C-alpha cells in the first residue's frame, strides 16, 4: 500500500491540530467545576464521565496525521493513569501547553533538540523541587481530603476510602464493585478469605444462613487429593480426643473419604468440614503455605516427605473461628507467629517488585493483604446504570490517588504546587539560548493546569494566576468557593506522585513531538467509481 508523507511545518501543524482536538475535549473536565463529557456507546445508555483518560481513550480522528498527534497525547494520559491512577487531565493540559509553545519556537527557527534538552532539564529540576515541597500523608483526615478532591469534591467517597484504609491498612486490598442499593457502602472482610466453599451441604452447622461455623478448630492442609479414608483416620482420632472441630483444606476430597466425613459429622462423632484448596498449580501451593503461615500449621505434602498417616496435632493449624458458605471460606484470627507472618508478607512484596505481569502483581497483592489483615470492598450505590458507571470511575480514581498520596506524600492542590515550582526555577539556564527557550516553555506550561481550573469555573484565568503568583507557600485559589487562602488548610491537596507523573509523562511525549520532522501514514483508499448503467436490450429501456 502506498504511503502519504508530510515534512516540517506541514506535519507539525497537522499533529498540533490532533493534539488540540483531544486536549480540548479532555481539559473541560478539570477541577471541581469541570464539565461532564457524554460518550455514545454502540449498545446501552451513553456514558457520562469527568475522567480524563476515559474521554481520551474514546477519541479517534478521521485525518490520520491529526490522529497520530491525538494518539500520542492519549498515551500521556494512559501512562499517567498506569503510574499514579489519577492526574490524567492535568497531564494532558501540560502536554498541550508544552507542545503548542514548543512548536511556535521551532517555527521561529529554534533548534528542536536544544528545546528538548531545555525542557528535560526543567522537568528534572521541577521533580526535585516537588519532592522538597511534599508533606507526608498518613492520617485519616489527609486521606479523606485527597479522596474527596480526586472524586470531584465528593466528600462521601473520600470518607469511605479513608475508613477502608483504616480497616485494612494503607497497603491493604481495597476493591470497588457495583452495589445493589442507592447508598455507597463499605464491606470489610476480616481475616483470610478465599473463594472455595464446603464440598457437601451436609457439613452445614447453621441451616438458616447456610453456613458452617467452626469455633477454635484445627486445620489440616494437604497438597493432594484425598480419596482413601485410611489416610485421614489418625488425624480424625486425634482431633476427636481433643474435642475440637476440624477443617480439611485439600486439592480435593472425594469418594469414600468424603462420604465417611459426612457420616461422622452427621452422627456427631467429630465436627468436620472439607473444602478445596484455592488456586491452581504453583499458586495453590503458595496459597496453602500462606494459610499454614497464618494458622501456625504445616502443609502435608509428599514433595517434602510428609505422610498423612503420620500427622500429629502439632502439624495442624489453628484459628479462633472459621465461617464457610457454599462459595467462600473465611479464617478469622489464625494463631500463626506474627514474626513469621511478617516475614512471609515481606517475601511476597519482593515477588511483587520482581514481577513483570500486572495479573501476577494483582494476585500477589491480594495474598499479601489477606495475610496482613483483610480485604475491603467498596460497593458503589446509584439510582441509574449511567450514574453507577460515572460514580464507579470516580471512586477508582480517588482510590488510586489516595494510594499515591500515602506513597509519596502530598502538595498544595489546584495547580498551586507547579506554580510555586516554576517560581523557584525562574533563574534556571541552559547551555545556549535555544535551551533557555525550552526552559521557559516548560516553566510557562506549569501554570496551565491552574489556568484551566479557573477557566472551567468561568473566572478570568490571568487575574487569578497573577494573584496566586504573588502569594507564597500554599497560598492559592479555591475553585469551589472562589476564595483565596492556604490550600492545605482548605483541604485542597494533590498527591505528589500524581503531580510528578503528570509533569514527567507530559514533558516526555511533548519533547518527542517537538523534535518530529516527518510523519508517514497509509494513503486513504479512494472509493471505487460507481458502475455505469447497463444498456437496455432490444425493445427494453436501460436497467435502473
Swiss-Prot record:
Domain of life assignment = Bacteria
Spell out the CDD domains in the cross-references.
Answer: GroEL
Q: Which residues form the signal peptide?
A: none
Catalytic reaction(s) noted? ATP + H2O + a folded polypeptide = ADP + phosphate + an unfolded polypeptide
Q: What are the record's GO terms for cellular component?
A: cytoplasm
Q: Name one GO biological process term.
A: protein refolding
Keywords, A to Z, come to: ATP-binding, Chaperone, Cytoplasm, Isomerase, Nucleotide-binding
Residues binding ATP are 29-32, 50, 86-90, 414, 494
GO MF annotations, alphabetized? ATP binding; ATP-dependent protein folding chaperone; isomerase activity; unfolded protein binding
Primary site of residence: cytoplasm
Compartment list: Cytoplasm
PROSITE patterns tied to this protein: CHAPERONINS_CPN60
Q: What class of enzyme is it?
A: isomerase
Q: What is its EC number?
A: 5.6.1.7
What Pfam families does the database record attribute to this sequence? Cpn60_TCP1 (PF00118)
Q: How does it assemble?
A: Forms a cylinder of 14 subunits composed of two heptameric rings stacked back-to-back. Interacts with the co-chaperonin GroES.
The UniProt family comment states:
Belongs to the chaperonin (HSP60) family.
Its function, per the record, reads:
Together with its co-chaperonin GroES, plays an essential role in assisting protein folding. The GroEL-GroES system forms a nano-cage that allows encapsulation of the non-native substrate proteins and provides a physical environment optimized to promote and accelerate protein folding.
Q: What is this protein called?
A: Chaperonin GroEL 2
**What is the species listed in this Swiss-Prot or TrEMBL entry?**
Psychromonas ingrahamii (strain DSM 17664 / CCUG 51855 / 37)
Upper lineage is: Bacteria, Pseudomonadati, Pseudomonadota, Gammaproteobacteria, Alteromonadales
Amino acid at each position: 500500500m502506498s504511503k502519504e508523507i508530510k515534512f516540517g511545518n506541514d506535519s507539525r501543524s497537522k499533529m498540533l491540530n490532533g493534539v488540540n482536538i483531544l486536549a480540548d475535549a479532555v481539559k473541560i473536565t478539570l477541577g471541581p467545576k469541570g464539565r461532564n463529557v457524554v460518550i455514545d456507546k454502540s449498545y446501552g445508555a451513553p456514558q457520562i464521565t469527568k475522567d480524563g483518560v476515559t474521554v481520551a481513550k474514546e477519541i479517534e480522528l478521521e485525518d490520520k496525521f491529526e490522529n497520530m498527534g491525538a494518539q500520542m497525547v492519549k498515551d500521556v494520559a494512559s501512562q499517567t493513569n498506569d503510574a499514579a491512577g489519577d492526574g490524567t487531565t492535568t497531564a494532558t493540559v501540560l502536554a498541550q501547553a508544552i507542545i503548542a509553545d514548543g512548536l511556535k519556537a521551532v517555527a521561529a527557527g529554534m533548534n528542536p533538540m536544544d528545546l528538548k534538552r531545555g525542557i528535560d532539564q526543567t522537568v528534572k529540576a521541577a521533580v526535585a523541587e516537588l519532592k522538597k515541597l511534599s508533606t507526608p500523608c498518613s492520617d485519616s483526615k489527609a486521606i479523606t481530603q485527597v479522596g474527596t478532591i480526586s472524586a470531584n469534591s465528593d466528600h462521601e467517597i473520600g470518607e469511605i476510602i479513608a475508613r477502608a484504609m483504616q480497616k485494612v491498612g494503607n497497603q491493604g486490598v481495597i476493591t470497588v464493585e457495583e452495589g445493589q442499593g442507592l447508598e455507597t457502602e463499605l464491606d470489610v472482610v476480616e481475616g483470610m478469605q478465599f473463594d472455595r466453599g464446603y464440598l457437601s451441604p451436609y457439613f452445614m452447622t447453621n441451616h438458616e444462613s447456610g453456613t458452617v461455623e467452626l469455633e477454635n478448630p484445627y486445620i489440616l492442609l494437604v497438597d493432594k487429593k484425598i480419596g482413601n479414608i485410611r489416610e485421614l483416620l489418625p488425624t480424625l482420632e486425634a482431633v476427636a480426643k481433643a474435642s475440637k472441630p476440624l477443617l480439611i483444606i485439600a486439592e480435593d476430597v472425594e469418594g469414600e473419604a468424603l462420604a465417611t466425613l459426612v457420616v461422622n459429622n452427621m452422627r456427631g462423632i467429630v465436627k468436620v468440614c472439607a473444602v478445596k484448596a484455592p488456586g491452581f498449580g504453583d499458586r495453590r501451593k503458595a496459597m496453602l503455605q500462606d494459610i499454614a503461615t497464618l494458622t501456625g500449621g504445616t502443609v502435608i505434602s509428599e514433595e517434602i516427605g510428609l505422610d498423612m498417616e503420620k500427622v500429629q496435632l502439632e502439624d495442624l493449624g489453628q484459628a479462633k473461628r472459621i465461617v464457610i458458605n457454599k462459595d467462600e471460606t473465611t479464617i478469622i484470627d489464625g494463631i500463626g507467629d506474627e514474626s513469621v507472618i511478617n516475614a512471609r508478607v515481606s517475601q511476597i512484596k519482593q515477588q511483587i517488585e520482581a514481577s513483570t505481569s500486572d495479573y501476577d502483581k494483582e494476585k500477589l497483592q491480594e495474598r499479601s493483604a489477606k495475610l496482613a489483615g483483610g480485604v475491603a470492598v467498596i460497593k458503589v450505590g446509584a439510582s441509574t446504570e449511567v450514574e453507577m458507571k460515572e460514580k464507579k470511575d470516580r471512586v477508582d480514581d480517588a482510590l488510586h490517588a489516595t494510594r499515591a498520596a500515602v506513597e509519596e506524600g502530598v502538595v498544595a492542590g489546584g495547580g498551586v504546587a507547579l506554580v510555586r515550582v516554576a517560581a523557584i526555577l525562574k533563574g534556571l539556564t541552559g547551555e545556549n539560548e535555544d535551551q533557555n527557550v525550552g526552559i521557559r516553555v516548560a516553566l510557562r506550561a506549569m501554570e496551565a493546569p491552574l489556568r484551566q481550573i479557573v477557566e472551567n469555573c468561568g473566572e478570568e484565568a490571568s487575574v487569578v494566576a497573577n494573584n496566586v503568583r504573588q502569594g507564597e507557600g500554599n497560598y492559592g485559589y479555591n475553585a469551589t468557593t472562589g476564595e483565596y487562602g492556604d490550600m492545605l488548610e482548605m483541604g485542597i491537596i494533590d498527591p505528589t506522585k500524581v503531580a510528578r507523573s503528570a509533569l514527567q509523562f507530559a514533558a516526555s511525549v511533548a519533547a518527542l513531538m517537538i523534535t518530529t520532522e516527518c510523519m508517514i501514514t497509509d494513503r486513504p483508499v479512494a472509493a471505487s467509481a460507481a458502475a455505469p448503467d447497463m444498456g437496455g436490450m432490444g425493445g427494453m429501456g436501460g436497467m435502473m
